[in-house]
UniProtKB/Swiss-Prot annotation:
Consists of two distinct domains, a catalytic core and a N-terminal extension that is involved in tRNA binding. This is Serine--tRNA ligase. Its EC number is 6.1.1.11. PROSITE patterns: AA_TRNA_LIGASE_II (PS50862). ATP binds at R262, S263, E264, E349, I350, S351, S352. Its main location: cytoplasm. GO terms for cellular component: cytoplasm.
Length: 415
């Protein structure tokens, strides 16, 4: 959540950031501006009434001590108190309206984030590893998965519905091996391995920014204040919800393997075949909680950590800087890692590493103490990696002419 003080003191800065994102809010910015103007006016009136109440109360006290008639002051205090209570209630209601608006306003766009309206305006930073030259036409992963008996798409539909899969046989062993490789790699890079619940309450989803704006994107347990997590970013970040951390403990680096659940609202017709877009998928996540001065360096560190796994698996990939119009709600700056898929003849996202600055920290009340003063931390998150998409990339990049799949050396010890 952005700072309420910033909204009140520099409304134009917030409006400019929303414009960069091509983002709109309910009732429009002008309506919000009107609410803020009215709030400021009433706040001044409230402070004036409070000052008057204090002044008259002192005068009343003096007269009472002197045993002088103070009935006129008493009446004045009673009338002023009625006005004070009414105005205080009105100011409180306006604060709630402003806070509700704040909860659905996305993060401020970082100065490093380029302007743009969609993914078409994202900027390639660099490529890592050269895509292989095939002597045959490479197949897509769903053909290879079925040929090798790695993935049973029909059973996924039978057990649940579309966008669910069953991984079995040697494919299940490869899938498990990928998870072990990712966790081991992350641990070597200083990230603590943590296993968390796959269900969280509403407060936790508010903390990381999924609620209230994106309620339709998450699965809610009927008759419970519980939701299936869309990413371990939610649980790892919120381990420190409403916590004051000693500055000596920063940075805090965590990694978790969890199932993730997404409704994929608005994705009808996209990636209907295969494992690219699923309602349930496994992901190994990185989350870091840092001192504000260290978050930029941490973002680079997390990118290189995720990239290191792809290098070990001999998978060509690239770094892409997201433009302002393609940023996620909580992100101030995001760099995607896209992996090469020869079957699709294109790069596809396999990780997003985002710096949310103090946006999530303010929502989740995550602070650190330095020089006897509490300040907001910075939080970062990124996939390291999406397991299903990594297996997709492995199948497509390491396929052989006969349809078999070569296993990279980095995975051998896990199989």
């Amino acid at each position: 959540m952005i700072d309420r003080k910033l909204l009140l003191q520099d409304f134009d800065k917030v409006a400019h950031s929303l414009k960069k994102r091509n983002s709109v809010i309910d009732d429009g910015l002008e309506r919000l501006r009107e609410i803020i103007t009215h709030y400021k006016k009433q706040l001044i009136e409230l402070e004036s009434l409070q000052a008057f109440q204090n002044k008259v109360s002192k005068e009343f006290g003096i007269k009472m001590t002197q045993k002088v008639d103070a009935s006129d002051l008493k009446k004045e205090l009673e009338n002023n108190k009625i006005k004070l209570n009414e105005l205080s209630k009105s100011v409180s209601e306006l604060e709630q309206k402003i806070d509700l608006k704040l909860s659905i306003i996305p993060n401020l766009v970082d100065e490093k984030t380029p302007l743009g309206t969609s993914e078409e305006d994202n900027i390639e930073i660099k490529k890592i590893l050269t895509p292989r030259d095939f002597t045959f036409t490479p197949k897509e992963h769903f053909e290879l998965a079925q040929k090798n008996g790695w993935i049973d798409f029909e059973s996924g539909v039978k057990l649940a519905k579309s966008r669910f899969s069953v991984i079995r046989g040697f494919g299940a062993k490869v899938y498990r091996a990928l998870i072990h490789l990712m966790l081991d790699f992350n641990e070597k890079n200083g990230f603590e391995i943590i296993y968390t619940p796959a269900l969280v309450n509403e407060k936790m989803l508010f903390g990381t920014g999924q609620l209230p704006k994106f309620k339709e994107d998450v699965f809610k347990i009927e008759n419970e204040n519980l939701y299936l997590i869309p990413t371990a970013e939610v649980t790892l970040t919120n381990l420190y919800n409403d916590t004051i951390i000693s500055v000596e403990k920063l940075p805090i680096k965590m990694t978790a393997h969890t199932p993730c659940f997404r409704s994929e609202a608005g994705s009808a017709g996209k990636d209907t075949r295969g494992m690219i877009r699923q309602h349930q998928f496994d992901k190994v996540e990185l989350v870091a909680i840092t001192h504000p001065k260290e978050s930029d360096v941490m973002q680079e560190y997390m990118l290189e950590s995720a990239s290191g796994i792809l290098k070990a698996l001999e998978l060509p990939h690239r770094f892409v800087q997201l433009c302002s119009g393609d940023l996620g709600f909580s992100a101030s700056n995001t760099i995607d890692i896209e992996v090469w898929l020869p079957g699709q003849n294109c790069y596809r996202e396999i990780s997003s590493v985002s710096n949310t600055r103090d946006f999530q920290a303010r929502r989740a009340k995550i602070r650190f103490k330095e020089n006897q003063k509490n300040q907001l931390v910075h939080t970062l998150n990124g996939s390291s990696l999406a397991v299903g998409r990594t297996m997709v990339a492995l199948m497509e990049n390491h396929q052989q002419a006969d349809g078999s799949i070569h296993i990279p050396k980095a995975l051998e010890k896990y199989l």
